Design a protein with these regions (language model features):
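Beta-loop-alpha module in the N-terminal Rossmann-like domain of NAD(P)-dependent dehydrogenases
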Residues: 54, 63-127
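Short active-site oxyanion
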Residues: 43-47, 82-84, 184
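Acidic-histidine catalytic/liganding microenvironments
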Residues: 40, 63, 78-79, 144, ...
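Rossmann-like dinucleotide-binding domain that binds NAD(P)(H)
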Residues: 173-258, 333
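A contiguous active-site-proximal alpha/beta segment in oxidoreductase catalytic domains
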Residues: 115-176
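C-terminal helix-rich "cap/oligomerization" subdomain common to oxidoreductases
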Residues: 1-6, 83-85, 316-354
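N-terminal Rossmann-like dinucleotide-binding module
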Residues: 1-62
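NAD(P)-dinucleotide binding in Rossmann-like oxidoreductases
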Residues: 243-314
Length: 354
């Protein structure tokens, strides 16, 4: 049997998601691109780039066999890579991704969100199609075992009545002054919330149609502005429809004193609650409280996975794709669809600020 090839890989960005989250002892590991790449035996991690010398020095002390660069163009000029991973800040996605596409790797892994705005994302798409470069977008929950279980279980809870998704943090939801940086939660973490709701509601073969947003007919329900800064949004609630569910609610708080991420899916025969630290599945059973009624009871047959493998499964999907064994589970088009939904919300917020 011939030996399977290793894919030569380069990383751009050695910050939190690129590198340092791999040292967070409370997080499920691997939690960074560096750790996930190093864990996969089919990856040959040969180069890394960062324009911050302190970060690069820290990275070099840990990953000693990887050649480091302060400039992407120099890195691209020295070698030909199978995979290029882009883990830079949102405001650098467009330029860095265009440069990476022109370096002609076999695959690009791009951190979420695709770009600051849909217009930038479409420029990336146009260049990717020109050079025929596939792009995997790291909306990590699409690769997580717990969400895979939830997606499969949805078919057993009957007709969907409602989906309520919530993100809580202390980061502003939106302000026009940060639009060029992406430093607001609607984009930064809201992309995870909207994307995973889309994942749960989309069909398995629904990944190819760019114009097909899973959520549509948006209505803004409530907005709360900062008490001192009138151009800062601290809370937004928006409702949507989808083919699978007529009532989808997205709530994002930027005034919470904690970080929370959860989704509550209610059907005619059951319920799913899933999120950070949450894994609950309910099914319809004869009621223990009332004669002639049914209640929802926890489905004890559904076991929480010991590890979700969200990051390692993402890298595995990249390898399987290059091997010709699998399609990308989170591609450029699903990423753009998510960005379109976020932009719908953002544009409504901008109208309210006028």
């Amino acid at each position: 049997m011939s030996k399977k090839p290793k894919y030569k890989t380069a990383l751009i960005g050695t910050g939190r998601i690129g590198f340092t989250l791999g040292f967070d002892r409370k997080r499920e590991q691997p939690a960074s691109h560096t750790m996930a790449l190093r864990k996969n035996r089919r990856i040959k991690f040969v180069a890394a780039c960062d324009n911050n010398q302190l970060r690069l020095d820290h990275f070099r002390r840990f990953v000693k066999k990887t050649i480091t660069f302060a400039d992407c163009s120099n890195m691209f000029a020295t070698d030909k890579f199978d995979i290029i991973v882009i883990a830079v800040n949102e405001n650098s996605h467009l330029d860095v991704t265009l440069d990476a596409i022109r370096a002609k790797p076999k695959l690009i892994i791009l951190e979420k969100p695709v770009a600051l705005c849909v217009a930038d994302a479409l420029k990336i798409q146009e260049e990717a199609e020109k050079y025929k470069i596939p792009i995997l977008v790291n909306h990590e929950r699409r690769f997580a075992q717990d969400y895979k279980i939830a997606k499969k279980y949805i078919d057993s809870i009957g007709e969907l009545i409602s989906v309520n998704a919530r993100l809580d943090s202390g980061l502003r939801v939106y302000t026009p002054s940060e639009e060029n940086s992406g430093a607001y939660s609607l984009l930064h973490d809201g992309t995870h919330l909207v994307d995973i709701v889309s994942y749960l509601l989309e069909e398995e073969n629904d990944l190819s149609d760019l114009e097909s947003k899973i959520l549509y007919n948006m209505k803004l329900n409530n907005i709360v502005f900062d008490k001192e800064k009138s151009d800062v949004v601290r809370f937004v609630s928006a409702s949507f429809e989808s083919l699978k569910c007529p009532n989808v609610n997205i709530n994002i708080s930027g005034k919470s004193k904690f970080f929370g991420f959860e989704i509550d899916v209610i059907g005619t025969l059951g319920r799913i609650r899933i999120g950070n630290g949450i894994f609950e599945f309910y099914k319809r059973e004869e009621s223990k409280l009332y004669s002639g009624f049914y209640s929802l009871e926890k489905d004890l047959k559904v076991k929480r996975p010991k590890k979700t493998k969200y990051f390692s499964n993402m890298v595995k999907n990249a390898v399987d794709f290059l091997d010709g064994k699998a399609e990308l589970k989170s591609n450029l088009q699903t990423g753009i669809n998510t960005l379109r939904i976020l932009e719908d919300i953002k544009n409504q917020l901008k109208n309210e600020l006028l």
